[in-house]
């Protein structure tokens, strides 16, 4: 397929997403099933266009003075893929599969409208109703934070030191253009792509199949490391999901101690068994029911709550959820988080730790949840992570890190990671 066919496909998929309110992955999969002739490189280019449109939805609609899928796609190709209008015209001229060109008025808008004149939430590509949350949390840098969430994300890998060291893994993966992560001691990074370029499918690499690494954002690696630094021998991963942090904790404990993994949504835990086997882990105990946890109250030195959340910190990778999030959804999530914190606290032994993590950068899901929990549970208090951060990473090397009341916030703008909130609470006798 040439560019014209890829543009036409992206427009078709965006219409499907809008009409049927589908997740982006479902629409891409459905299109691929009905267009089997499309090669892997074509599918990657089409996926890039669709993701870029949803990342920059508001700003693209503003400069084109139109939010129809055709205009949005052309805006991304010209502005973000850096293909000028005249060059694109020549590329599409003889392509039989090219869609109709935008109206002259739309192209005129593209050349005349200046994004700096747009309302700030449009410049930041975030829903207008969330602007106040960003402003209250990040103050003068809120717009930079918002803009950073509309960029492409790199591909981060976590070395599994149970099987290999980072130096050896780096040598085996150097042909992918990897480099060392800037913060995580176990991380390797493949930089974000531009235009039609795609990230490599590293899961096909023999080193992945041998269990030498896991795909894990650097931010997730960092919060896992901060969780493990307490040297707890008994850890409960209360919202284990697919097991990303469970596996990281097992590695950080060098396969010693015991990690219990549980999740209220059993389907989310489906991948964990195969991942545990591939990683060579044998200190993880899986729980399939709430009843199996009941006898373990006040048993754990650390309880990790990687709480279900809005996912605002992952917008670079999942831009469609940005536009599906509503005030009602956020309220429902915060109520769920309150319940989970209360449920998980009963498993923390005296002088133990309750670690609260979200992949959100909204205060409603983060520090406000902590303050609410502490108001109901005075036998817990915030245990500052500043000294531990300095021990692991040296705060002087990361002066922009956002630390509030001893808790930390990671963001694409501050740490070049996904957005995360980390808070460690200590239970007192």
Predicted regions and their residues:
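S-adenosylmethionine
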Residues: 1-429
């Amino acid at each position: 397929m040439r560019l014209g066919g890829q543009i036409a496909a992206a427009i078709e998929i965006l219409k499907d997403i809008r009409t049927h309110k589908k997740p982006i992955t479902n629409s891409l999969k459905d299109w691929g099933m009905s267009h089997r002739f499309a090669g892997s490189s074509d599918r990657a280019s089409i996926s890039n266009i669709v993701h870029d449109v949803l990342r920059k939805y508001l700003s693209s609609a503003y400069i084109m003075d139109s939010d129809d899928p055709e205009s949005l796609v052309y805006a991304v190709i010209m502005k973000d893929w850096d293909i000028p209008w005249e060059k694109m015209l020549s590329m599409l001229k003889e392509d039989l599969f090219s869609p109709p060109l935008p109206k002259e008025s739309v192209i005129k808008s593209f050349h005349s409208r200046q994004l700096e004149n747009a309302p700030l939430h449009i410049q930041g590509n975030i829903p207008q109703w969330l602007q106040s949350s960003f402003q209250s949390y990040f103050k003068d840098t809120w717009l930079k934070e918002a803009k950073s969430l509309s960029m492409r994300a790199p591909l981060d890998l976590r070395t599994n030191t149970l099987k290999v060291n980072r130096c050896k893994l780096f040598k085996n993966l150097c042909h992918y253009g990897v480099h060392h992560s800037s913060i995580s001691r176990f991380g390797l990074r493949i930089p974000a792509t531009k235009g039609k370029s795609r990230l490599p499918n590293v899961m096909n690499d023999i080193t992945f199949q041998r269990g030498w690494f896991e795909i894990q954002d650097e931010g997730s690696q960092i919060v896992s490391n901060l969780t493990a630094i307490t040297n707890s021998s008994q850890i409960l991963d209360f919202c284990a999901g697919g097991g990303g942090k469970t596996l990281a904790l097992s590695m950080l404990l060098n396969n010693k101690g015991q990690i219990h993994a549980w999740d209220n949504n059993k389907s989310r835990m489906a991948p964990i068994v195969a991942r545990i086997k591939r990683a060579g882990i044998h200190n993880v105990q899986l729980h399939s029911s709430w009843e199996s946890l009941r006898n373990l109250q006040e048993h754990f030195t650390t309880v990790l709550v990687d709480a279900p959340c809005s996912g605002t910190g992952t917008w670079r990778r999942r831009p469609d959820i940005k536009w599906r999030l509503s005030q009602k959804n956020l309220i429902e999530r915060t109520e769920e988080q309150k319940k989970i914190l209360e449920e998980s606290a009963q498993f923390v032994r005296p002088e133990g730790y309750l670690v609260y993590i979200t992949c959100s950068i909204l205060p409603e899901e983060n520090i406000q949840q902590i303050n609410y929990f502490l108001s109901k549970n005075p036998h817990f208090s915030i245990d500052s992570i500043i000294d531990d951060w300095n021990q692991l990473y040296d705060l002087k090397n990361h002066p922009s890190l956002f630390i509030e009341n001893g808790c930390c916030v990671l963001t694409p703008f501050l740490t070049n990671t996904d957005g995360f909130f980390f808070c460690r609470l200590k239970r007192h006798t």
